[in-house]
Amino acid sequence: TGDGEDVGYPGNDQSPWVFERKWEIDSLCYPIRLAYHYWKEVGDTSVFDSKWEQAMEAVYRTFREQQRKDSLGPYRFSRVTDRQGDTLLNDGWGSPVNPVGLIVSSFRPSDDATLFGFLVPSNLFAITSLRQVAEILRAVRNNTDLAGRCEALAGEVEEAVKKYAIVEHPEFGKVYAFEVDGYGSRVFMDDANAVSYTHLRAHETKA
């Protein structure tokens, strides 16, 4: 269930438009994917107004914030529940991560809490989405500043994936972990919901 039972930032004053405040990277990627392909298929640029531009600035800012380089950021989530996967440990901050350039996703697309905060398929999705945003910003809004920042962030996350998410499996050799923490911990699995490794091709996302 959602409204009224959660504690932590931003308190219990959540908007009626928000069912629950589980932070997932893909929640910001899907609107970008929809807008990008609408533009490519229809050619309509009227949707990319100043409000859209402000929203993309917020997406960029949120991704940067959730790299957790300077602090944990304002987001935390705690819920009274008998399911471990329905809340975050560590007083709502989730498992500790090493700020190596990857983006924290507190929850998976399945709504289960991540075991380790760096959910790799979602980071790969973010790379694709940031580059799609940059393409629109350059072609439609002539906003080279935000476009450049999005491209730089995509490149940083991509390099961090290569360095920290490709690990040695005792049986299969070098593989992508599903989640990592930047300290060396990793989990090998895939999740049923999209985006996951099974769905990457459908999301124009490369591993």
What are these regions (language model features)?
Residues T1-G85:
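Aromatic-rich carbohydrate-recognition surfaces in CAZymes
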